[in-house]
């Protein structure tokens, strides 16, 4: 919680009261920002929480322009691959690549925060033939990274056209917290943990309970 935090919404009165008591004692500035959510719609629906989590757990992150990112996380490092996809918004190929990379520079910085990715990160932007385009993309990327509260450092383009960067590890990534290795594919993929699935089911039950008056739920 810092000066940029506008509000903290909590949909449980019990948890709200506990956090309020805690914040008044240890974090007085945060107490005024706590809000008890009393709306009819589940708070995750209101803020598209499930959709955002699903996007942050997926390998592919699609953009409105048609371009997309492919994010792969391994034990050693994380790679981010930029692709044009169906983007046809520019007059020529160079402009298409430039616009896609510029949009990706903003999206990558956001995905690093959402997924809480740390350690060594390799970004493979689409090859650009013009030096000024590379400089503008790198400047935009560093500008977006500067907004991150976690320490990040980004180098320039390597001879292979890759950007190497590091982001300080503060805790486990989102995928490591919510997922576990997939046994069906020998650990090459990931699936949600039993706890994560249980929370999904609970939110769905609450969603249905607010619309109907069922006598029981069978799972």
Where are these regions (language model features)?
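DE-rich acidic low-complexity regions and acidic surface loops
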Residues: 1-219
């Amino acid at each position: 919680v810092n000066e940029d935090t506008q509000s903290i919404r909590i949909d449980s009165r019990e948890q709200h009261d506990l956090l309020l008591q805690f914040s008044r004692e240890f974090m007085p500035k945060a107490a005024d920002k706590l809000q008890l959510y009393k709306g009819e719609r589940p708070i995750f629906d209101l803020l598209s929480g499930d959709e955002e989590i699903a996007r942050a757990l997926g390998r592919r992150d699609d953009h409105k322009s048609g371009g997309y990112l492919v994010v792969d996380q391994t034990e050693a490092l994380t790679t981010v691959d930029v692709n044009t996809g169906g983007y046809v918004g520019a007059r020529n190929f160079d402009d298409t690549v430039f616009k896609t990379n510029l949009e990706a520079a903003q999206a990558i910085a956001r995905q690093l925060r959402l997924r809480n990715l740390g350690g060594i990160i390799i970004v493979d932007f689409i090859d650009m033939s013009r030096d000024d385009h590379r400089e503008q993309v790198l400047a935009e990327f560093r500008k977006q990274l500067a907004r991150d509260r976690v320490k990040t450092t980004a180098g320039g383009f390597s001879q292979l056209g890759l950007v190497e960067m590091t982001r300080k590890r503060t805790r486990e990534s989102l995928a490591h917290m919510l997922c576990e290795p997939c046994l069906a594919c020998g650990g090459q993929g990931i699936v949600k943990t039993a706890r994560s699935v249980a929370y999904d089911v609970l939110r769905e039950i609450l969603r249905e309970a607010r619309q109907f008056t069922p006598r029981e739920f069978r799972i």
